[in-house]
Amino acid sequence: MDIDLRLHSGDLCKGDDEDRGLDNVLHNEEDMDIGKIEDVSVEVNTDDSVGMGVPTGELVEYTEGMNLEPLNGMEFESHGEAYSFYQEYSRAMGFNTAIQNSRRSKTTREFIDAKFACSRYGTKREYDKSFNRPRARQSKQDPENMAGRRTCAKTDCKASMHVKRRPDGKWVIHSFVREHNHELLPAQAVSEQTRKIYAAMAKQFAEYKTVISLKSDSKSSFEKGRTLSVETGDFKILLDFLSRMQSLNSNFFYAVDLGDDQRVKNVFWVDAKSRHNYGSFCDVVSLDTTYVRNKYKMPLAIFVGVNQHYQYMVLGCALISDESAATYSWLMETWLRAIGGQAPKVLITELDVVMNSIVPEIFPNTRHCLFLWHVLMKVSENLGQVVKQHDNFMPKFEKCIYKSGKDEDFARKWYKNLARFGLKDDQWMISLYEDRKKWAPTYMTDVLLAGMSTSQRADSINAFFDKYMHKKTSVQEFVKVYDTVLQDRCEEEAKADSEMWNKQPAMKSPSPFEKSVSEVYTPAVFKKFQIEVLGAIACSPREENRDATCSTFRVQDFENNQDFMVTWNQTKAEVSCICRLFEYKGYLCRHTLNVLQCCHLSSIPSQYILKRWTKDAKSRHFSGEPQQLQTRLLRYNDLCERALKLNEEASLSQESYNIAFLAIEGAIGNCAGINTSGRSLPDVVTSPTQGLISVEEDNHSRSAGKTSKKKNPTKKRKVNPEQDVMPVAAPESLQQMDKLSPRTVGIESYYGTQQSVQGMVQLNLMGPTRDNFYGNQQTMQGLRQLNSIAPSYDSYYGPQQGIHGQGVDFFRPANFSYDIRDDPNVRTTQLHEDASRHS
């Protein structure tokens, strides 16, 4: 924002006046009187009482004023930048600003002096009309003008910042008065985490002015070195977006990574619903960095999962500065903290040397796999000359990948191709072979990918963002569509949930396999499974080998004109097919169904019905009865976990919302009555279930005639502090909590505070490893790991992306697809004609 003190009030054009709004600065005298004051404050309505715990470690505690106020001698390129800096400071602290006076040089007529002050500076009650704008431009519709004039209460506050212009043109802070003689306005102050980001940036204003989106003729400091390359205004837009999302839901998480020079390097965020859903779908996660690798203007990295409806869900987004080991390490560590420390069973990434080294360090117990589409793309890139010279190279290469039933078959075909095309000494191919267990289907016998790895990126989850992203997409453009996309995905998930519980699936065949899972699978997955059931009709099995425990069948697939080897272990009830459909998609293929039917089975072995694809993928009920939890900390987090489940169910319909609303209102009243009844804290601690029982009885009486009175005794899972709490000893009483003192935090490395409910002190529950700033962290359903105490009772869920999957099977060409509708007349032959091949 440029503030031109040189313009007189009569010289401002209408366009300038409208564009600047409250930021107009008008001066029409050489030495302004105290009365000529303009209130240029911007109201910040965050209502953000969110606190975030400062983790333990080699850190210093942050106080409100630390490194945030202006410093004498701080330099600025112009008086406009100096004023913008003071404005941001005032926003962070919670007061309004005004330009107190300014002074010109008598010789050059250039401004050489300016004083910016609190809007309550002075002793007289002054009036201005629409911020000193000419009468002709005052709007009668403006509420400020409806009363004729606007009052500006004065308290003789001395808070101000005085800047002077040096001969070299730089503006420096000559004096600064910090103290106010009135209360500040917390409702207008930005959130604590934003305040601390500003504090870190204030050390060097060259970096600070970029973060708060001040205009500058010089090149942005973010474009120098390994820092986040975003335009000046984009970062403030992003920061405002993150603050707004967290104000809507305290479980929204974000983190800002700062370099040693206090420049922003990376930014990460994940919404509340994603963190909640991750507990149910933490088996497979992918990380796509295509937009970073392809040098998009917005270097977006995306963590993606898939829910029970085969809808893709974003589990985290980040803007990263580069593809270095340090950046990826920070990103993965931050994401791991955000989702409660529970690593995924499988993490799929692109083929990258840095990824290969970082993933095992951050996720030692996670199976690291590679996108097959990316492997194939890299083959074409690195062996482009070979591909051009030999038309049969890719067909031979794909045959090795897709049609090698055993490890030795893959190795034999691989080395045969290397010899045939003169690639025995090619280092890239040697390296690719060493990583074969991360991407080759032959080696995926012990992994479940849930449809997350496909042969073409167009079929992959992350291709969804291609509809919204292009090379020149800015942060501002992305933020504009982000909310809409999240809301749409959330509504689609709710629609799928409603269909799942209220609509009966249509049967397509008399197969016992189809019938056995019709009430188990979600509709989306059931339709995919139906394709395999109908496809089994075109398969013919022939037993080739048998021993004491296993039988091997050759299944002829007439639709694909290809044979598939299927192994059946009757003792262990295990079946496997070389097409690897179960490993890649999570449900049995037609070839295995054909063999099971041949072996006289009428139902699918239970281990092949993955819970993640069932209607009960998300646990719908708690079990057990309330137990005595000795600390407020444990009680708070247990209630938060249950509240998340309540939100998930109650948000599906207006009727369920009404039930939950009445129950919560009743519970709050009952709890307040218990807490104010005069009983001492020890009494409450020793009788934690009494209030819960009365609440339950009250809720049942409220809902009589509307809902069933049948009680589901809820058994609480036993809490083991040694297992459920992060590896920092949790206090055993409120008295012990009061004795805790945060360790020191350096500007170079800090987290946002994690603050408990009112009356409790800050708990430091996590320690950082690198320079960063963390947004609020919350206990999540199913994770049972204590990240923090939620600072807000707000149970609104931030919308979540649930991107519909394409459903293109791994070994099937993209130009074929099934369209299963509830049409009993659909012919099996039609399905066969449309079906894609397994390999």
Swiss-Prot record:
Q: Name one GO cellular component term.
A: nucleus
The MULE domain covers 284-380
According to the record, mutating residue 180 to A results in:
Loss of DNA binding. Loss of DNA binding
Stretches for region Disordered: 128-151, 693-725
Q: What is the induction note for this entry?
A: Down-regulated after exposure to far-red light. Subject to a negative feedback regulation by PHYA signaling. Up-regulated by white light.
Task performed by this protein: Transcription activator that recognizes and binds to the DNA consensus sequence 5'-CACGCGC-3'. Activates the expression of FHY1 and FHL involved in light responses. When associated with PHYA, protects it from being recognized and degraded by the COP1/SPA complex. Positive regulator of chlorophyll biosynthesis via the activation of HEMB1 gene expression.
For this entry, the protein name equals: Protein FAR-RED ELONGATED HYPOCOTYL 3
State the organism of origin.
Arabidopsis thaliana
Gene (name only): FHY3
